[in-house]
């Protein structure tokens, strides 16, 4: 007879401590990268979302060479964190300010806490936080750990000092085992790609080797921040409606509930919905049965006349900033970008943006350089499993003037949504949702058409140059004949006139063709005044 089974529950902290790879911490190299990423994303959400031009300083120091322990410190000038929220914000898994119906870089209330858990598994130093909210006269300091069994913060140390400098923002330092040589290229690439789409930010990065990289602010223009909106009927399920009902502050009728708590439902639409469900408009919403809630959700899914979800909850990068970032980093000959109109999937609004850069200083490769972004987060790992890569790979680039397998091109795609369909909690690749895939393809085709037009005009220009340059071989004969005609028999004037005619013709051709060194062409065609 088999032994009796033992049953037990796990706290969220214990679950992710046992399964760190699910949160993007499978090994020291990835853990170091993921820690940097999570802290930078928190800093950006604390700045640009609130209309603050980001100043972000990232430092990685090797503090224990024998054990390869690194200290990652990120400092921002954001809104800061209320001191009463700091312990839970950093010490309770699945506790977050990002459980709202608007676009955020974070989603799960997991990121930085996963770094703390990984840190605790391998060394004993607590996470260190310094923060001062906007207009606060105090600077608050904390040292924290996580009680893994209880999923609660352990406050190792806390204090506050007078804030005499007017500083507002947050500094977070985490000591973590890492592999800098293996993580180095990914971390540098992540910061560079973040800068491409946030050219309004300033980044200073000091790596463990002592190298300092400065990314200057290129503009003071910040994209419109996302606004929190009510849920769309298409995007809710039974349990979400039950939670909404339980959280109501007053005793609504079902019609009042529909009109006040959802977007896209006005008086007429509410009446139509309730008629389809078979509910009286004046029935108290808290008296709904389980079966009635089920019918309501099913009606939501089938109803075809809802307005599309509001895009106010989204924040795009914008075409100007996309091209500004691409030009700064890649120095191309050509850039184009597009911000598509809002669409929706499963009741969640989304917008696709695309950019393309061609030629110039872009290195030639067998594949284009693909920059993937989701809610303004660069996606560095798992590239080939992402829907963006799938669309780029399947697009017939030859139709758009790319005639060889040697690409000198950067392709950028940004997806923003209130719900990004990531393949895992590590947030590195986007799933193949049909509506999203279609929009990505449409966006890329649109910028590809702009590239095709540019390449077509460039080829026509080159052909025109060839034809005009072909006429150079006639310059000596034509200039001499004109000089003889103008000299009217005075042979001494012929060289003078011929020289003036040659110079005039070459100035005209040089201006017409925008040639920098016309002398090289004079040597080729042996055109000199006599």
Swiss-Prot record:
Q: Which UniProt keywords apply?
A: ATP-binding, DNA-binding, Isomerase, Nucleotide-binding, Topoisomerase
Q: Name any one GO molecular function.
A: DNA topoisomerase type II (double strand cut, ATP-hydrolyzing) activity
The record's listing under InterPro entries reads:
HATPase_C_sf, Ribosomal_Su5_D2-typ_SF, Ribosomal_uS13-like_H2TH, Ribsml_uS5_D2-typ_fold_subgr, TopoVI_B, TopoVI_B_transducer
Which Pfam family would be a valid example here? Topo-VIb_trans
Catalytic EC class: isomerase
Q: What is its EC number?
A: 5.6.2.2
Which residue spans traverse the membrane? none
A GO BP entry: DNA topological change
Keyword match Membrane: no
Sum up the protein's function in the record's words: Relaxes both positive and negative superturns and exhibits a strong decatenase activity.
| Subunit architecture | Homodimer. Heterotetramer of two Top6A and two Top6B chains.
Q: What's the name of the protein? A: Type 2 DNA topoisomerase 6 subunit B
Organism source for this protein?
Answer: Saccharolobus solfataricus (strain ATCC 35092 / DSM 1617 / JCM 11322 / P2)
The organism's lineage is: Archaea, Thermoproteota, Thermoprotei, Sulfolobales, Sulfolobaceae
What gene is behind this protein?
top6B
